[in-house]
Amino acid sequence: TLFRSVNTIRDDNITFDDISAVMDAGAQAGVLQKQEHHFIENVFELEERTVPSSMTTRENVVYFTLKENENSIRQKLAEYPYSKFLVCNEQIDQVIGYVDTKDILVRILNNQSLLQLNESTIRTVLIIPDTLTLSEVLDRFRSTKEKFAVVINEYALVVGVITLSDIMI
C-alpha cells in the first residue's frame, strides 16, 4: 500500500512531566522566578505526599492532661512556642481536644486558674487518618475551617499532629 494509517485522534492529556518541562523552560527564560517555580512544584507534591511526611510525630507532640498541675502547664507554655496544645485524659491516645495558647494566656493575665481546663477552653479537634495525602488534608482544613489536626493510624492510635503551616512549608 502507498498510504499508511495515521492516528487522527488527539491526546489532550497533560502529564506532570509536560508541566514540569514548561516550568523549567519558563525558569530558564526568566519568565518564572525561582520562588514561583518552587511554589508550583510544591503544589504538585501535595497530591503525592502523605501526612506522615509533614506531621509532628507522636514522640514530639507536647500535650496537657486534665490532671496536669498549673506549674507544669506554665512550664510547657514557656518552653514550647506552639499556638495549640492537645488536651488528653491521661495519655496521648486519649485525646479530648485542644487548647489555643491565646485562651490560656488570657486566663493567666486575668489571674484565673489553669487547672480548670473545661469546655470553655477545650476545643474539638479534627482527627484524620495517616493515609491521606497533603492535598486531602488541605481540603479537610478548608471545609472544617480548622488549621490543626490529630493524625491517627488504622488502630486509632495517635501518630502525630499536623498544622496548616506544616503543609505549606
Task: Give the role of each language-model region.
Residues 10-169:
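Soluble cytosolic regulatory domains appended to membrane proteins
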